[in-house]
Amino acid sequence: MAKNIQAIRGMNDYLPGETAIWQRIEGTLKQVLGSYGYSEIRLPIVEQTPLFKRAIGEVTDVVEKEMYTFEDRNGDSLTLRPEGTAGCVRAGIEHGLLYNQEQRLWYIGPMFRHERPQKGRYRQFNQLGVEVFGLQGPDIDAELIMLTARWWRELGISQHVALELNSIGSLEARANYRDALVAFLELHKDKLDEDCQRRMYSNPLRVLDSKNQDVQALLNDAPALGDYLDEESRDHFAGLCKLLEAAGIAYTVNQRLVRGLDYYNRTVFEWVTTSLGSQGTVCAGGRYDGLVEQLGGRAAPAVGFAMGLERLVLLVQAVNPEFKAESVVDIYLVASGADTQSAAMKFAERVRDALPGVKLMTNHGGGNFKKQFARADKWGASVALVLGESEVAAGEVVVKDLRSGEQTTVTQDGVAAHLRTLLG
């Protein structure tokens, strides 16, 4: 017997019982995005490898350790996208969307990183990203955070997420801070773990978010990033904080929040939760005003964020069990009799035409009434329509409310109005 082929470790199948809650959550996210006037952009899963090296930074963990990179038959180096911002910027430049224009975009789809699989973190994961181009004030930063706060309210998880903010300043200010931080770390090199020693020169700001508690204790005496901010970045951050306070959005300033990708400047933020065990990031982003020019376009301010959907789904299921998936089926059509199946299928099409938002499933494969009603229950239907030979001949249908057990016979022409009342 041939050996079964299984999914690659860290790349998961999502079965019908799981995808229903995903669809409801994604529908909620998309509805809110539409209410703010944001438009969808669809991007390739595979990009040229240099795009990510230039955008993310060659000495980041993503590029050094986590990318799925391969050569195609032409000898070109290609990479499965590890994140969406670089591809979105590339598309904006390529199609002339960014120069002297304002764009508010979102995308959704799979990303790929070769990480150690664990709860809420996988090698293929689904991400929703939002990117805004052409606006440089703190007001658009605030709008993005307000948009995410609306998501949490709609999903019923507001009490289980907390906002952390920081400003990492201009590129010049960050370079000055980098020098001061490296000088401090050199004095205490013997107290750094191997990973932090490696990052000390290649990407020293990443030492700030080390998970090593001894390193975190050492950093209490390190230079503070906030002391090195340029005046323009200070004003921008103060403006953002003022807008969030006016909107009633609570936040904590975390001066060790730097984000893991090289393209960020000024505002960085994360929504975090402790409701999935240890603290985890639900959604994160910030400004990247230099990235468009860095990738070959004309300079354009930009800000955005991304959210891993696996972790969001886990969080919603953990803290808001009342947020359930909608039933797969509203109405189940039961047919009985040798010549009723054709009539039942034709009648089902009439009902779908009259009630386009209703989910109606027709019984197939025969079976007596008991078996067909059991199938209706399995699919979660709240109403059954019953067509037997006598109903077909009379132009009628039996409508049974599966919640109350009550049933009535109505004309086939009048069934749509009856169902509207019954289904609410």
From Swiss-Prot:
Catalytic reactions of this protein: tRNA(His) + L-histidine + ATP = L-histidyl-tRNA(His) + AMP + diphosphate + H(+)
Top-tier EC class: ligase
Localization, UniProt: Cytoplasm
Gene Ontology MF annotations: ATP binding; histidine-tRNA ligase activity
Keyword Cytoplasm: yes
Swiss-Prot/TrEMBL keywords: Aminoacyl-tRNA synthetase, ATP-binding, Cytoplasm, Ligase, Nucleotide-binding, Protein biosynthesis
SUPFAM superfamilies with a match to the protein in the record: Class II aaRS ABD-related, Class II aaRS and biotin synthetases
Superkingdom, taxonomy of origin: Bacteria
Gene Ontology biological process terms from the UniProt entry: histidyl-tRNA aminoacylation
GO cellular component, one term: cytoplasm
Keyword Ligase: yes
One Pfam family this sequence matches: tRNA-synt_His
Principal place of residence: cytoplasm
EC number assigned by the record: 6.1.1.21
CDD domains in the record: HisRS-like_core, HisRS_anticodon
InterPro entries: aa-tRNA-synth_II (IPR006195), aa-tRNA-synth_II/BPL/LPL (IPR045864), Anticodon-bd (IPR004154), Anticodon-bd_dom_sf (IPR036621), His-tRNA-ligase (IPR015807), HisRS-like_core (IPR041715), HisRS/HisZ (IPR004516), HisRS_anticodon (IPR033656)
The protein's assembly and partners: Homodimer.
Assigned protein family: Belongs to the class-II aminoacyl-tRNA synthetase family.
Official protein name in the record: Histidine--tRNA ligase
Organism: Enterobacter sp. (strain 638)
